[in-house]
Amino acid sequence: MMQEETFYSVRMRASMNGSHEDGGKHISGGERLIPFHEMKHTVNALLEKGLSHSRGKPDFMQIQFEEVHESIKTIQPLPVHTNEVSCPEEGQKLARLLLEKEGVSRDVIEKAYEQIPEWSDVRGAVLFDIHTGKRMDQTKEKGVRVSRMDWPDANFEKWALHSHVPAHSRIKEALALASKVSRHPAVVAELCWSDDPDYITGYVAGKKMGYQRITAMKEYGTEEGCRVFFIDGSNDVNTYIHDLEKQPILIEWEEDHDS
């Protein structure tokens, strides 16, 4: 059993013009969940990721690891579908439609979209209440940082081959995060596109439709990203934040699980 082995949460964040706390520009972040023997390799990979990012050259970086004491849950990745669109306008229109299909009202979707430009500097995710149409979390610029999830490479590569998806670490990380977030009972849907100027694909994810990639969500060269979790829950928002930050999750795809 996997549980016998001790796992470590490894995290990286990099910024330019000082640390994030000092108002520096966010460059890159990374989250891994690994056994100890992969530590050197993982730390080097995160270092490389932070140093070679298209958002710029960092002058502040932090890499930390800690032992995880909570028991690790293993889950399936969300099913993936790629939607080819010809322009960001078409992509955003489709995203709104998919959010509605997933159970977010049109009114709440529009309220979120009105505020998305203001949230472009939020480093983590914004939690948005589907009842009030207001932001729930009080984390301001920091956002909620989903952590402690990973997808072991060998299994991911097998999945990518089977799913006819390129085996890029970007897809691995995004799908691992979306799969962890989506399994939370209070999360109705996630809307995301990257703050990386070189990457314009985004997605809508949810329990009903899985992970819906959309090939154009913004113009090339723009550094405004988005990550919004639409929440339907009466519990205290801090319990949701705790789950997303602390519950350790490993993705493990099994071929017969996919329809």
UniProtKB/Swiss-Prot annotation:
It is an enzyme of class 6 (ligase). Keywords: ATP-binding, Biotin biosynthesis, Ligase, Magnesium, Nucleotide-binding. Its EC number is 6.2.1.14. One of its GO terms (molecular function) is 6-carboxyhexanoate-CoA ligase activity. Pathway: Metabolic intermediate metabolism; pimeloyl-CoA biosynthesis; pimeloyl-CoA from pimelate: step 1/1. It catalyses: heptanedioate + ATP + CoA = 6-carboxyhexanoyl-CoA + AMP + diphosphate. One of its GO terms (biological process) is biotin biosynthetic process. The keyword Cell division does not apply. Disulfide bonds: none annotated. The keyword Cell wall biogenesis/degradation does not apply. InterPro entries: BioW. Its cofactor is Mg(2+). Belongs to the BioW family. Homodimer. Catalyzes the transformation of pimelate into pimeloyl-CoA with concomitant hydrolysis of ATP to AMP. This is 6-carboxyhexanoate--CoA ligase. It comes from Bacillus subtilis (strain 168).
